[in-house]
Amino acid sequence: PEDELSDQPDRLLAAEIVREQIYRQTHEEVPYGTTVETETWEERPDGAVTIRAAIVVAREGQKAIVIGKGGARLKAIGAAARAELERELDRRVHLFLHVLVRERWDEERARLRAMGLEPE
């Protein structure tokens, strides 16, 4: 879709900000092999944006670390990322995160290309 191309830089920014918060909140308990995929970006009539993103990890243990006890760490990651996105985009942001386990995701050539990381 046409709107998907125009918001591509913002979609990448959203993924990078969420990824940064994962590293800050997990204190390097989760390897840097974690990635974030912005799944949807929806402009709202009130000027806000709704972003849905997947945090992708390689193992169940990493998923548990990212989610935290009772979802507390995932909530903290989302709150901090949302606040930073609102500052960067200068508008209200509704951010929804979920965690996926995708074994060996980092070896998937198509996904690497989609993230702008061409494998050697």
Regions found by a protein language model. Give the residues of each.
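C-terminal-of-GTPase-core extension/linker across diverse P-loop GTPases
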Residues: 1-120
